[in-house]
Amino acid sequence: LPYVNRMLEEYETAHSYLECDENSLFKALFAAVDAKDMPGMTDVDSSLLYFCSLVSRKNKVALTGECADEIFGGYPWFYRKELLERYGFPWSSDVAPRLALLRDDVGLELDLSGYQAFRYEESRSKAPLLYGEAGEDESRRIIGYLNIKWFMQTLLDRMDRTSMYSELEARVPFADHRIIEYVFNVPWHMKYQNGVEKTLLRDAFSDVLPPELLHRKKSPYP
């Protein structure tokens, strides 16, 4: 809330304070499955659906921040060595919780671990590598590609389905293909400096945002 108040003070804009408690989160779970037309990310989906439904009561178009972390390297797997070197999709390293939802015989028949490894190798082989890159630079380029190819698509689909279900048009400016194409080839040392992620993005808004907002640590959601 202090950051919101600072923003209001700086820009004198009109904002509504929306809050989602556990009960509201729970009530929106089944509607979130309907909105996505398949099982999803439980509370992550239901909280987004809840807020979209509230926003749509007064506004029919909204700007969102989807894709900034995927493009500018905001996730830990871009800069934490142990995650960077881990085999497999960094956002889905353990299939055990998924298998626990299935009967043992069904889990064995599906072989989710094998399928995941196959898809990872297949996708990794298609990453557009740069001649002369190696080591961590090459690994980050591969992870960046995997983020755009898989993780980002999941978030865009989730936002589109959830917002449309709520009669809200959500626009995603960071997903502009011109931004993605340009930033994908920007050297890592320009995206991450002095232990701070998304440095390039922060620098781009350094003359627009107050320092306390510009350098605020990312807050997990929900």
Regions found by a protein language model. Name each.
Residues 147, 166-170, 222:
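A ubiquitous short alpha-helical element
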Residues 147-161, 183:
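Short Ser/Thr-interspersed hydrophobic loop/turn segments at strand-loop and sheet-helix junctions
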Residues 209-222:
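PAPS-dependent sulfotransferase catalytic core
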Residues 156, 208-209:
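Conserved cytochrome P450 K-helix E-x-x-R motif and the immediately C-terminal K′/meander segment
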Residues 1-132, 138-140, 161-208:
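ATP-dependent adenylate-handling active sites, centered on carboxylate activation for C-N bond formation
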